[in-house]
């Protein structure tokens, strides 16, 4: 039997061409694996059949929506993960899950090679290949788009010459990646930093002015850092993301225009849409402000940033990430309560917080009757707190 290549298949141009190219140029069989991460668009059965029509000996569809939400989106929420304080890791968190299922498919279908359709300029090649090296170092990796310098024009020409059944146009301006956590758009005229995004860039969000007269107030409930309810009704993590995608998206919430530092050393402009993600991260962050002790909250802000960097850099399976998550599990013991927000005009405005685990003490905080704060203790505290600065200043003024 010929060697088998297990291909991460999206249904798009590059991976459809890859099926035919691998067969013709290397004589290997291709098993196409398409992962449903809630990306919507084409029916997954249509994508599966396209892989077969392109020459795959087998085509597998994996419904990983709940797994993605519980195992990948949820840690992103609990870590308040925003790379460069902006990007909620839309694509980055999906790659390790795809890697996991490709490795499983290789074991099941007798594959000795795994393949992806990434270019040599992006982060995803790193995420895929570091993931493969971590989970299955025995598997060979094939990256035809990168290793053979495919361009879009070359891929289209190959598709036409070999009657590959896929509808494409050389004028299609954008590169798009999407899943239930969000949508990423790049290339085309967006590569010129002064060009503003046009309406056709967006699909998950409405124009922020469209529903200007009808703001949406929403209450998100958490238990130990896990979103469990919306407006008092129980939801799964996936259900929370999907509902907030719809509601926040209708208010234009979650649009991000970002110039980010890629792992490969270049800067790249990306347009992201992540309405549900931004609402959940905002709500979770706010609940931590209420329930985490000051020093713990201050330190966790550092680990949140480091976790986001590790995931962005393709180190999902790293020991440091695993250690940080053990720390975060401990921090979430008291992150239980509800956050109320108004979604309006592209913005998220928090206007209410309640938690049985709150560290906010009304009697200590109030300036009105009932104040229990012992203000007589403040004078000595201020003296001791500023003593080291006072001594240093006295020395410097000699």
Swiss-Prot record:
Catalyzed reactions per annotation: L-citrulline + L-aspartate + ATP = 2-(N(omega)-L-arginino)succinate + AMP + diphosphate + H(+)
Keywords of this entry: Amino-acid biosynthesis, Arginine biosynthesis, ATP-binding, Cytoplasm, Ligase, Nucleotide-binding
Gene Ontology terms, MF aspect: argininosuccinate synthase activity; ATP binding
GO BP of this protein: argininosuccinate metabolic process; L-arginine biosynthetic process; urea cycle
Pathway stated in the Swiss-Prot or TrEMBL entry: Amino-acid biosynthesis; L-arginine biosynthesis; L-arginine from L-ornithine and carbamoyl phosphate: step 2/3
CDD domains: ASS
GO terms for cellular component: cytoplasm
Presence of the UniProt keyword Cytoplasm in the record: yes
List of residues binding L-aspartate: 119, 123-124
Location relative to the cell: Cytoplasm
Transmembrane segments annotated in the record for this chain: none
Similarity field: Belongs to the argininosuccinate synthase family. Type 1 subfamily.
Name of the protein described by the UniProt record: Argininosuccinate synthase
Phylogenetic placement of the source organism: Bacteria, Bacillati, Actinomycetota, Actinomycetes, Mycobacteriales
